[in-house]
Amino acid sequence: MQPGATTCTEDRIQHALERCLHGLSLSRRSTSWSAGLCLNCWSLQELVSRDPGHFLILLEQILQKTREVQEKGTYDLLTPLALLFYSTVLCTPHFPPDSDLLLKAASTYHRFLTWPVPYCSICQELLTFIDAELKAPGISYQRLVRAEQGLPIRSHRSSTVTVLLLNPVEVQAEFLAVANKLSTPGHSPHSAYTTLLLHAFQATFGAHCDVPGLHCRLQAKTLAELEDIFTETAEAQELASGIGDAAEARRWLRTKLQAVGEKAGFPGVLDTAKPGKLHTIPIPVARCYTYSWSQDSFDILQEILLKEQELLQPGILGDDEEEEEEEEEVEEDLETDGHCAERDSLLSTSSLASHDSTLSLASSQASGPALSRHLLTSFVSGLSDGMDSGYVEDSEESSSEWPWRRGSQERRGHRRPGQKFIRIYKLFKSTSQLVLRRDSRSLEGSSDTALPLRRAGSLCSPLDEPVSPPSRAQRSRSLPQPKLGTQLPSWLLAPASRPQRRRPFLSGDEDPKASTLRVVVFGSDRISGKVARAYSNLRRLENNRPLLTRFFKLQFFYVPVKRSHGTSPGACPPPRSQTPSPPTDSPRHASPGELGTTPWEESTNDISHYLGMLDPWYERNVLGLMHLPPEVLCQQSLKAEAQALEGSPTQLPILADMLLYYCRFAARPVLLQVYQTELTFITGEKTTEIFIHSLELGHSAATRAIKASGPGSKRLGIDGDREAVPLTLQIIYSKGAISGRSRWSNLEKVCTSVNLNKACRKQEELDSSMEALTLNLTEVVKRQNSKSKKGFNQISTSQIKVDKVQIIGSNSCPFAVCLDQDERKILQSVVRCEVSPCYKPEKSDLSSPPQTPPDLPAQAAPDLCSLLCLPIMTFSGALP
């Protein structure tokens, strides 16, 4: 073959890669069609998985394309290429000993550390991932599967649970079938151990591992024997990942695994003289739970504690008291031997990839442009100029003791084996780091009791008047929930003798060993409003009494779907008292210019389109699923390799594969601003509600209520805005500016409808400094009254960008309000509506609460609080 020539297989893989990247550049929005593009990534994975040798071909082409991106400065393509590289390495069966592909990849991605965030952060994570794979081949696959299957080991005890929340009334039956298939137990512990051991030995020994023979011998082992072999193998991999030199780590791991194999009784199938054939070992299906969800709360997630209590029992996921005792002992040792700690703090170990396949936060830089093999093996731990990028890695996952330093392990023989390595690694921490941790413990030890959600402040009240907190936000339309208090074990519900720790809801410093709870929600903008209200309630409850956040860090995933047309009036529970009639379907609310022409059968998906504008890879692989019919997404994908090894292949629909891809590789959240509205009813009662996408007021809300009544809507009749009875409203709004200043306006309008929507439909609205709502006014210019006919309105529409607004009915004129296109959140007889950004619940009873200066007006207090945002996981986060 001539130099530069390619084979047919290479051409096919290159063509599939080009299809994956098509339309992701800056000109992607000019593409008028997008149906089928979401299958390109899945098709590429299917093509490559047919032969183990295809993975190396794809990796070479990804690196070549990445170098072109670096030369041309094509920012939009870096994140998809990095994710493709990560997922491909994760599934690669084995890297030959003479392959320098990972070294070239480290050299390539090292050049992107000077790019802006998030591109430099993504490359930092890739460098850490590559470093771990160089030292312990296949360790990232092992961690991911261990976490998803609930198989913790002593030194790495994290777990990942995936929960699918669907409303059967909202989604098609095909989606429900796929969700139920995912939640069906597919892998027994015996099968999971077998898969992990096959992968570990093949990743280390390559073609010299007789995979079919090893599979037969593992099948003959009992579950207890497999667990012992797996524990030794996994601990050896974790130890190898902490060795400084990659070549030495691989040699030690190979020797250790060979000894484990001989001890287990199958030496003939490991390190055979005659090389055999590599086998593709797919990632097993993650543990999933599927629930029917149509509430404004996440109370149903407490059932996960009941299902996972074996993994959550004290001493399995970690004993806080023992860890604190160890930290105190380490602090004492450092105080008596400060110079030793200062010297040892220069020795840092590389960080490990996160258990849920999210790339762990780490970086590495080289002192020169050319990266030799020797420099690459220690680019995370040994290069001092890694500090230039502002990166310091301090991961307790990298606490594995070096194999040749065993004398230190025997000094603390009374401790658990998994704690020996943590004990040694903590000696390497600097005194300043321990002081910071001690200070954080003192803050966490304070009471987390929270006050009810409060308003951002009255819009038109004088500054010298105190702002009274509104009544507690009410949960609306929550279905009856089982009382889990009698089912959960006592160690979960017993009052703690000291304040309980909880995981931060959103933090870059989360414990990488913490268990993860993935919450995947399906639906339209109506469902996104329910998620926002449930998230707000969850924060308030967890601030008062941590339960879920004591054991899990929460990740929220949003899968948009078109609302099902087969909604029946009897499918929805009865509405709250303010709702006029039983709701069924949520029609799509037309814009003011489309009133009377657009059908109401569907709700919008603006939130998902907003996420797609922020993250093109989310738009391609998640939002694009809406453009395909369910029968295509539910086709089965059969992997022949799994059939050859397991005997019972796991056939997953395309939709299931894409959902698992989204959950495993979407690691960066996009923060969606949550809004609150304080409503005053004609009786004087007040209530505070949460919304995230839209608030409809007046005729549009009343029409939605009539449409939701089902067959009764024909009897009531539906008029458009031209026939609606006008409302005289006083509208006071604050128009924000880039400088942060606000300009207030006060006007009186005669309107039929006033709608507030999140400004998220245009590319120019993505600037985070200009977070705003779009105020849509349907104003009556002139009303024509006739004795023989109905009154007829001449209307005009206008739009205003606002950040706060107050709407008051003149002479206490009542109107209806609908939140997030939700028929269950239609409130009648409202005379006053105040809308403002929502703030996080306050924490009371802090050890030293900050005192407000007497000269500071009460109106300014909300500025000291953080805005409440709903974190939705995406692949790249918000791109600059």
Curated annotation (Swiss-Prot):
It is found in: Nucleus; Cytoplasm; Cell membrane. Keywords: Acetylation, Cell membrane, Cytoplasm, Disease variant, Membrane, Neurodegeneration, Nucleus, Phosphoprotein. Residues 315-339, 389-416, 454-510, 565-601 are annotated as: Disordered. GO terms for biological process: G protein-coupled receptor signaling pathway; immune response; phosphatidylinositol 3-kinase/protein kinase B signal transduction; phosphatidylinositol metabolic process; positive regulation of MAP kinase activity; positive regulation of phosphatidylinositol 3-kinase/protein kinase B signal transduction. Residues 653-753 are annotated as: Interaction with beta-gamma G protein dimers. It is a peripheral membrane protein. It is linked to Ataxia-oculomotor apraxia 3: An autosomal recessive disease characterized by cerebellar ataxia, oculomotor apraxia, areflexia and peripheral neuropathy. The heterodimerization region allows the binding to the catalytic subunit. Regulatory subunit of the PI3K gamma complex. Required for recruitment of the catalytic subunit to the plasma membrane via interaction with beta-gamma G protein dimers. Required for G protein-mediated activation of PIK3CG. Heterodimer of a catalytic subunit (PIK3CG/p120) and a regulatory (PIK3R5a/p101) subunit. Interacts with beta-gamma G protein dimers. This is Phosphoinositide 3-kinase regulatory subunit 5. It comes from Homo sapiens (Human). The gene is PIK3R5.
